[in-house]
Regions:
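Active-site glycine/GP-rich loop and adjacent strand/helix microenvironment
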Residues: 16-25, 33-167
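Conserved structural elements of the adenylate-forming
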Residues: 1-14
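Conserved AMP-binding
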Residues: 28
Length: 167
């Protein structure tokens, strides 16, 4: 309960107390296939408590389920939408995949929380500024991005990056 309380307090100042429509930028397999269950799965399950009408953007083959995301986008077009995923996976399987297809999802307001995977992106020379810019381009202009640290290394102790880029 304490760890769950630790997760709730920092995020409520960013997303409010109301549960938002949640699009998980991952595959549901991470939750249903126990061989894939890890800190990643625990993070997804923990973060899911902040959402409602939760959907997974990626199919079992880590491809964007365009029909599902388009339907989610249409259903929640005039609402603030919450998204969560792992930094590298969002880059690889969402941002780059959408760019390659020349596709965007025009949400009116999106709050994205992402965690982990910066070491993998370092090899690709992706800065925080570039990451946030391209994330905003594929999900529309009203994107608020929050990078945070702590789920893998210290499950339950969460540190959200401030507006100046400090944790």
């Amino acid at each position: 309960i304490f760890k769950n309380g630790t997760i709730i307090d920092p995020k409520s100042s960013y997303i409010g107390k109301k549960r938002l429509p949640l699009l998980l930028l991952d595959t549901e397999m991470v939750k249903t296939d126990r061989t894939m269950f890890s800190a990643r799965g625990a993070g997804i399950i923990g973060f899911s408590t902040f959402g409602r009408n939760t959907k997974y953007a990626l199919d079992k083959d880590m491809q964007i389920d365009f029909g599902l995301v388009e339907e989610f986008c249409e259903k929640h077009r005039n609402e603030t939408v919450l998204m969560f995923g792992y930094t590298y996976m969002i880059w690889q399987y969402v941002i780059r995949a959408l760019e390659e297809k020349g596709k965007t999802f025009p949400f009116s307001k999106v709050i994205v929380f992402h965690i982990g995977g910066w070491k993998k992106l370092k090899d690709q020379a992706v800065s925080t500024l570039e990451y946030n810019k391209r994330l905003s381009q594929v999900f529309g202009g009203g994107v608020e991005v929050h990078n945070y640290y702590g789920m893998a290394e210290q499950l339950g102790s969460v540190f959200v990056e401030c507006e100046y880029g400090h944790m």
